[in-house]
């Protein structure tokens, strides 16, 4: 009989397996590398895949045990589990304050503790951080939460301290303050060398980032982390590396989409105006994508003026408005036009001083500031319940980014009955048109998203 020897980070098979079964496992626990076709031309001996099962030692990430079992079951191989993990001693749970868990949140927390590790998707605005806090409090063990952005770190810290009423440590942005519950920017993980082996509960927020190398290095250093969870508010990764999410934290256990949350009254329904912006100039042969983006998006005065006109219509209607862009130059171009008609306009991005970014964001949350231009720092993870209108001006191709951006607007807020989004849908240029189609495909997956094609500003009803 085959033994599945399970440890916190790595597991392995012990026993004699037919080489064909080993090959089946090697193939199952793999993912095709994007762009591998070209690399294979240089190295014909490579199959173009990244493998997560070693043939020689029959080792694999513990989160993939369920996939190994599927292969063994398919080939009628008998096996038994040998669990070498040491479960942390149970502690009294921390009481929760200032929050009442929704039914699905209670189910997520209880199931996650029972399963010990999980990948959990709760659509943006569904109270993912509240679930995280409740799970941390119920386990009440040494916990590390990995994040990748300063604004998210501060937001999670404030939420955990409000709900659990205990101090929460932070590592990142020049701060090293380690406590039994600590939030760390993944870029600052080198500061945690002595803390990592003591961690019982390892979590990753915005879990679609987990396939990055640093996440994996930290996960492997947390040798005693019995409980492992990844949280995300977006659709699963759009490349083939979703298997890395499973390897980090186990099987995908929960998938609560936006339409379910809207139906149950936990999010407001969105109305998405798809503004058809026709580009007159045709892309020349041989021109790069960055050159197309620069000419047709970043430096396109007509398009930028349209974005500003839509924003000003919203300001006059007293709607709090966020304009999302990708590149600093684009934001600066928009700001130059906007400042002429709205001097209070502000543009924040990754290079903006942290104090200014947090101040502007706080003013926006409080409603004292009505209009912001922002790069991707506000496109993901940041909670802005009062946001009423989102203008996506960045011609984004990523479906994950589209999910995240839309989620900025769906949160409940007093007096808010629906979310408004204007997506500048570029047509007439091949690359940009394909990006438009990608975003529309994301919106179309949610049955309660209302899509409204428009061709002029008067059709945008605020």
Segments from the language model and where they lie:
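Walker A/P-loop
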Residues: 115-136
């Amino acid at each position: 009989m085959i033994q599945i020897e399970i440890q916190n980070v790595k597991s392995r098979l012990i026993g004699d397996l037919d080489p064909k079964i080993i090959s089946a496992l090697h193939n199952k626990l793999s993912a095709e590398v994007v762009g591998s076709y070209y690399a294979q031309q240089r190295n014909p001996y490579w199959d173009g895949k990244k493998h997560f099962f070693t043939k020689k030692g029959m080792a694999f990430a513990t989160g993939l045990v369920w996939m190994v079992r599927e292969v063994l079951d398919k080939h009628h191989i008998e096996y038994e589990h040998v669990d070498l993990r040491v479960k942390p001693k149970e502690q009294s749970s921390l009481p929760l304050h200032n929050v009442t868990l929704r039914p699905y949140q209670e189910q997520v927390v209880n199931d996650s503790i029972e399963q010990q590790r999980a990948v959990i998707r709760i659509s943006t605005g569904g109270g993912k951080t509240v679930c995280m806090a409740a799970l941390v409090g119920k386990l009440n063990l040494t916990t590390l939460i990995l994040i990748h952005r300063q604004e998210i770190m501060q937001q999670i810290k404030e939420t955990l301290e409000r709900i659990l009423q205990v101090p929460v440590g932070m590592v990142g942005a020049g701060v090293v303050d380690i406590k039994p519950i600590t939030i760390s920017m993944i870029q600052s993980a080198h500061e945690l060398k002595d803390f990592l082996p003591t961690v019982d509960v390892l979590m990753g927020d915005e879990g679609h980032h987990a396939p990055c190398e640093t996440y994996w290095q930290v996960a492997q250093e947390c040798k005693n982390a019995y409980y492992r969870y990844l949280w995300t508010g977006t659709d699963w990764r759009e490349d083939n590396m979703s298997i890395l999410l499973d390897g980090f934290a186990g099987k995908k256990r929960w998938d609560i989409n936006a339409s379910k949350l809207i139906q149950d009254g936990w999010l407001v329904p969105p109305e998405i105006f798809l503004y058809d912006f026709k580009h007159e100039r045709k892309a020349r042969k041989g021109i790069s994508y960055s050159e197309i983006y620069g000419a047709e998006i970043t430096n396109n005065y007509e398009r930028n003026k349209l974005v500003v006109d839509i924003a000003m219509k919203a300001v006059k209607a007293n709607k709090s408005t966020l304009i999302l862009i990708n590149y600093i130059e684009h934001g600066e171009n928009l700001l130059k036009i906007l400042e002429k008609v709205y001097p209070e306009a502000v543009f924040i991005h990754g290079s903006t001083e942290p104090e200014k970014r947090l101040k502007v964001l706080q003013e926006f949350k409080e409603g004292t500031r009505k209009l912001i231009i922002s790069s991707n720092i506000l496109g993901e993870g940041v909670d802005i319940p009062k946001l009423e209108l989102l203008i996506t001006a960045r011609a984004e191709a990523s479906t994950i980014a589209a999910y995240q951006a839309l989620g900025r607007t769906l949160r409940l807020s007093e007096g808010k009955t629906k979310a408004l989004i204007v997506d500048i849908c570029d047509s007439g240029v091949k690359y940009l048109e394909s990006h438009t189609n990608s975003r529309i495909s994301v919106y179309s997956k949610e049955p309660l998203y209302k899509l409204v094609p428009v061709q002029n500003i008067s059709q945008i009803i605020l």
